[in-house]
Amino acid sequence: MLTSLNVIPFDNKNKFIKIFNSIRGDRVKSAVVRGGGIAVNQLTYYSRSGKIKPGKLLRALGGEKIILADERAVLPEGITRFCSNNFSERLCVNMALGVLRKIKNPLDLKLGIFDPEAHSPDLLFEALKLCRNPVAVTFDLLPYDRIRRMALSELGASAVITRRTSELLNCDFVVAPTKICAYIPIKKNAVLLTAGKPYVRLFGEIYHSYAVTLPEIFEKLKPDGLSAEYFGSALYTLCGFYQLGSLVPLSCYGETGGQTVKSLAEKI
């Protein structure tokens, strides 16, 4: 069973409601929703102050240690917010391939892949079906070199595999399937697609989160206050619904706004 938490501050604008809430105190409501072979215990914490009282929440959790919650939630000691980038990495790759398929002249595109730990070497093989001479920057060369040799044999296509991040400076479109933890050189007018907001400041137009439509049965289970990307991540990682990894996002978002697959393809 998955457990989610949504914290809702009391409405204290009305004086009489404020007095009533102060007497009643914080409360926790539980609703178990089932479907698709799983159950979600949706906890709603109604708070006078907007903060969580540890004792009250811990009693409601009944020993559960990992919960789904908004990243801004301040949780009691011993309770961990679920966090995984595995699903977002798949969304990033799927979005990138969707964009490449929509670009009018993909053979003229200078594509870069930044995947330091070689989480998504399959991206290179699929990209080589669509564009010419992409650059893959990785610190784990073997998986990418294996893909490069397979692509050369099956597609007659070649790619540059390197550890040098400076190679990304020549790229118009950079795909980084994992969250970026250290500075990488990207030109100012390049588009960067990644999974999760980078930990460092970078140049380029950066998109790091995704809007996705889950299958209807899972949409009905999604707790209020959680994005489909985050809830999908829990279904993918904790419940083993790996088929969700084939979903193509409707759009991607960054600090400058959002783009659909089509609009991003037209922009690059």
Model-derived regions, located:
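Structural motif
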Residues: 6-11, 43-48, 68-71, 113-118, ...
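Metallocofactor- and cofactor-centric catalytic cores in central/energy metabolism, strongly enriched
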Residues: 9-75
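A short, well-structured beta->alpha microelement
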Residues: 24-30, 45-55, 150-170, 179-183
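Short, charged/polar "capping" segments at the starts of alpha-helices
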Residues: 72-77, 120-125, 142-150, 182-184, ...
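A glycine-rich, Thr/Ser-enriched phosphate-binding loop motif common to dinucleotide/cofactor-binding enzymes
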Residues: 80-98
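Glycine-rich phosphate/diphosphate-binding loop of Rossmann-like nucleotide-binding domains
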Residues: 103-167
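Rossmann-like adenosine-cofactor binding region
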Residues: 157-220
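Adenosine-phosphate binding glycine-rich loop
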Residues: 193-268
